[in-house]
Amino acid sequence: MTIAVGRAQERGWFDVLDDWLKRDRFVFIGWSGILLFPCAFLSIGGWFTGTTFVTSWYTHGLASSYLEGANFLTVAVSTPADSLGHSLLLLWGPEAQGDFTRWCQLGGLWNFTTLHGVFGLIGFMLRQFEIARLVGVRPYNAVAFSGPIAVYVSVFLMYPLGQSSWFFAPSWGVTSIFRFLLFAQGFHNLTLNPFHMMGVAGILGGALLCAIHGATVENTLFEDGQDANTFAAFTPTQAEETYSMVTANRFWSQIFGIAFSNKRWLHFFMLFVPVTGLWASAIGLVGIALNMRAYDFVSQEIRAAEDPEFETFYTKNILLNEGLRAWMAPQDQIHENFIFPEEVLPRGNAL
């Protein structure tokens, strides 16, 4: 018998770090966590700081913090001033020159929150890839999460990059998001944009599929327990099915005449519909960033202008958009000092 005697091979720092990052713990860290956790912490922390203390007086002429009297629905971390263009607004940059108070007044926290937020989302997507690899499953969760990332990037980065400055991006707050919705409708007629329509169909369709699927599974659970609560009869490791696909198929065949007969196709469809909708929405936002127009039904507009008795929901909406632009712009872009005389303000066709 031969016995080999020798020292164990020394492990490099990379292997030691790899083992520590992937150690089994309550909250998995992983390599993705190096990006995810700091960026998520700083982005969320920046939002709480801004909504608590920081005014929007110097950028939007608004009160936007709890300190000034706003509430949860009206606080916001506001976009920088229009005059700052697409500056990264670094704390040590030429605008703030290391002055934290000045940096907050200029809107630096919006850049801080948004840019750390996008890298946090990318880190979360990488986390799903990493854990899928370690557990040994396919990475469709990460693929699905590309939808929210695409919308985030298109709304908060691509849209303002296509416009004159970060000022026109949504500020981080509830009512400030509503302001962005009204702005996008008034200036881009977004609801008539086919990509926005596909996005609405995808999100509402996904919600409908989710509700139908959940209800159908609950309807066709096997009677395999004695309790009034059916949840207690299920264990995650059981080999048996917990509901009857055959019965579900029969039910929907009677309702619609057609039904899913393949669970894999059914669940892929539930993935496909909302994610495709989110991708389509992101494409639409890039379009309006470049000021591409939605559908224009010019013949209806010409006839409505000539005939006071002819009006469609389309021409009515065009007038509403004119109103949004005329009355919103002086409030929204106070730095432009817009003054519109009475004769240029929109009026209904019949007046």
Curated annotation (Swiss-Prot):
Predominant location: membrane
Binding residues annotated for pheophytin a, in chain numbering: 128, 141
Recorded topology in the membrane: Multi-pass membrane protein
Entry's cofactor comment: The D1/D2 heterodimer binds P680, chlorophylls that are the primary electron donor of PSII, and subsequent electron acceptors. It shares a non-heme iron and each subunit binds pheophytin, quinone, additional chlorophylls, carotenoids and lipids. There is also a Cl(-1) ion associated with D1 and D2, which is required for oxygen evolution. The PSII complex binds additional chlorophylls, carotenoids and specific lipids.
Listed Pfam families: Photo_RC
Entry's Gene Ontology molecular function annotations: chlorophyll binding; electron transporter, transferring electrons within the cyclic electron transport pathway of photosynthesis activity; iron ion binding; oxygen evolving activity
GO-annotated biological processes: photosynthetic electron transport in photosystem II
The UniProt record lists the keyword Electron transport: yes
Family: Belongs to the reaction center PufL/M/PsbA/D family.
UniProt name for this protein: Photosystem II D2 protein 1
Species this protein is from: Acaryochloris marina (strain MBIC 11017)
